[in-house]
Amino acid sequence: ARCAILVEGDSEYGSFPLFAKKCDIDLDDCGICVIQAGGDSVLQLIQLAEKFGIPCIGIRDSDGDNTPTSIPNLWKTTERDFEAELMKLIDIGREEVLCDILCEYDSEKQERILNAQALNKRAYKKYGYLTAPISTDLKLSDIDKTNITNLKAYYSTWFGINKSQPLGLLIGMKLSKSEIPQIYVNLIEQAKSLC
């Protein structure tokens, strides 16, 4: 490889090759490889690659800390993490894309019940989509499509529970270029410029 893109998780690893393809960038032709580095390893792998003269760029979850990194080729997500980046689709009226992904991936489709404990752990404590803990379970088919709060609570929890390389691959397949979070488009284009 002439350049490496370092990502934190399974979902990013699965989705990035298809994101690149939708940006008209063939990772193989450009000699770009995507490496799943895990959370804290992105920085260390960038530093190691630089010692060997290998151009690379990495992205890690901001986890709510949006201060810029002191390393130019270490980027942070605009939102808290990969799953939160996907929630922007709800904000732009494209919730059906998330529903399509869920229905293809999950055998229970819109009938999947997420328990209150899981929702509170992610949607309330981690993301802050819920303003207070809830005591009831949620099922996607019961959520009004105008209830942005509950949609984000449901989807952020579901994507968090199910994050994996196969889910990332499906996300990469289902999102159009305009639906790919801009931070990832910019990162892939920057990687191409390093080759």
Stretches with model-predicted labels:
Residues A1-L6, D10-C195:
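Acidic, Mg2+-coordinating catalytic modules of nucleic-acid enzymes
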